[in-house]
């Protein structure tokens, strides 16, 4: 089995014009898409495409829900890069818990045929309250990191996420290839100056019946917690009189 659980912390830091910082513990599922249909047969409270306390629902993730996620993701990469992934595809994400799912960011790692290195990373972003989605497809040819176990991609913001960050932003994303740990670090630059960063520091846990029970009890409302903290931090920024930027579509209307 290649699927597993990753547990650790997420940290956000805003440097200007009103400093703000928070950090909290969380867990993610790391899912080999080929293993999905039978992955949760080991636990009665977890399921695939069936109502349960914890469940994977195809419609919560990228693409047409009538097309298998594995196929949809490979089609996306081929359409963007001209090369179809020919190895495993593994997804770092949240599932649906107690009927609720929200993923600020999910990461698809597309491995080579030998399953030894990540060739392409797809970052799927969701926003709230607009419930929109957008994918950044990051090919190996644009990797700027000198280490074979890390990736670095610099690219322009294309999708509205936060009303407290303007659209004219450059991203600097660094990711470590998943192994015993996962590291993700994203920096937002505005006019060449650091505005914000976000970091994930996660450690691998074996996916078994006991571990699935433990994370349900330790993080009983994982995705609800994510959304609640998003709005709590938004309130803090409002109270600090942080500048507000409307959704670009609303500006145009």
Named regions from a protein language model:
Residues 1-253:
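Mature, function-bearing regions of proteins
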């Amino acid at each position: 089995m290649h699927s597993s659980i990753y547990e650790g912390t997420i940290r956000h830091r805003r440097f200007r014009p009103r400093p703000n910082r928070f950090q909290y513990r969380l867990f993610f599922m790391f899912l080999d898409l080929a293993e999905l249909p039978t992955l949760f047969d080991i636990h009665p409270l977890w399921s695939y495409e069936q109502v349960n306390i914890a469940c994977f629902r195809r419609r919560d993730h990228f693409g047409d829900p009538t097309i298998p996620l594995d196929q949809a993701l490979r089609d996306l990469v081929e359409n963007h890069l001209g090369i179809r992934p020919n190895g495993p595809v593994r997804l770092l994400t949240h599932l649906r818990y107690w009927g609720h799912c929200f993923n600020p960011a999910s990461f698809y790692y597309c491995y080579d045929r030998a399953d030894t290195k990540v060739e392409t990373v797809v970052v799927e972003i969701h926003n709230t309250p607009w419930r929109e989605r957008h994918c950044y497809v990051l090919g190996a040819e644009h990797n700027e990191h000198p280490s074979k176990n890390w990736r670095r991609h610099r690219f322009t913001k294309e999708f509205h996420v936060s009303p407290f960050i303007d659209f004219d932003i450059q991203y600097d994303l660094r990711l470590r290839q998943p192994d015993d740990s996962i590291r993700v670090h994203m920096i937002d630059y505005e006019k060449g100056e650091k505005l914000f960063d976000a970091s994930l520091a996660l450690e691998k846990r074996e996916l078994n019946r006991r571990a699935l029970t433990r994370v349900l009890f330790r993080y009983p409302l994982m995705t609800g917690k994510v959304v609640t903290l998003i709005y709590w931090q938004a309130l803090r920024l409002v109270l600090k009189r942080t500048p507000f930027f409307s959704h670009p579509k609303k500006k145009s209307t």
